[in-house]
């Protein structure tokens, strides 16, 4: 009986070691350029670029299958950052994919909401809370302002409310110039 247990323990250890070695040996690395591009994109998952989310768009840019100017939520600033990262000239935002809008969040008029759950199904970031035939509400901190919840609503109880520019949402609008650290040598 103990022999069978020791055989099973030995097999488990051997298989574990083989699996561990295989995981290290055959590890698939993601595209590091796509990772950097994805970090620049606004993560609204809105699909305005023609891709189902920011990650697929980043991968398409990295492969050269998409242009850098297809993201309206990222605006001109996003295009400039992508151009700088990729070492290409910035392009004007492609208006075929939409125009930049002020940052906003969805708001559900809970008196009008019929609880159909269509908005919940449409939200790519799960920023809508509610149940069938119950009123729904937006989790404002999670909402990216993608507007994907507007179209499926049969009673038009969802509206977009611009985010006020207060301290947590304020952003420096002027270009930031990187300063050299004291003592850093300059190249000639």
Swiss-Prot record:
It is an enzyme of class 7 (translocase). InterPro entries: 4Fe-4S_dom, 4Fe4S_Fe-S-bd, 4Fe4S_Fe_S_CS, Elect_transpt_cplx_RnfB/RsxB, RnfB/RsxB_Proteobac, RnfB_subfamily. GO terms for molecular function: 4 iron, 4 sulfur cluster binding; electron transfer activity; metal ion binding. It is found in: Cell inner membrane. Binds 3 [4Fe-4S] clusters. [4Fe-4S] cluster 3 binds at residues 123, 143, 146, 149. Its cofactor is [4Fe-4S] cluster. [4Fe-4S] cluster 1 binds at residues 46, 49, 54, 71. Residues 29-88 form the 4Fe-4S domain. [4Fe-4S] cluster 2 binds at residues 113, 116, 119, 153. Gene3D superfamilies: 3.30.70.20, Electron transport complex subunit B, putative Fe-S cluster. One of its GO terms (biological process) is electron transport chain. Part of a membrane-bound complex that couples electron transfer with translocation of ions across the membrane. Belongs to the 4Fe4S bacterial-type ferredoxin family. RnfB subfamily. The complex is composed of six subunits: RnfA, RnfB, RnfC, RnfD, RnfE and RnfG. This is Ion-translocating oxidoreductase complex subunit B.
């Amino acid at each position: 009986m103990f022999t069978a247990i020791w055989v099973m323990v030995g097999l488990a250890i051997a298989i574990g070691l083989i699996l561990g070695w295989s995981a290290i040996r055959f590890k698939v690395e993601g595209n590091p350029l796509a990772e950097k591009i994805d970090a620049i994109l606004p993560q609204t998952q809105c699909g305005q670029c023609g891709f189902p989310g920011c990650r697929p768009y980043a991968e398409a840019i990295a492969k050269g299958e998409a242009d850098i100017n297809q993201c309206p939520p990222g605006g001109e600033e996003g295009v400039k950052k992508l151009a700088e990262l990729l070492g290409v000239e910035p392009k004007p935002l492609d208006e075929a994919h939409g125009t930049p809008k002020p940052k906003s969040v969805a708001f559900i008029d809970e008196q009008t909401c019929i609880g159909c759950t269509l908005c919940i199904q449409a939200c790519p970031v799960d920023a809508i809370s509610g149940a069938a035939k119950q009123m729904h509400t937006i989790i404002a901190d999670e909402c990216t302002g993608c507007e994907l919840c507007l179209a499926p609503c049969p009673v038009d109880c969802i509206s977009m409310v611009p985010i006020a520019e207060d301290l947590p949402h304020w952003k420096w609008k002027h270009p930031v110039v990187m300063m050299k650290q004291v003592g850093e040598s300059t190249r000639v």
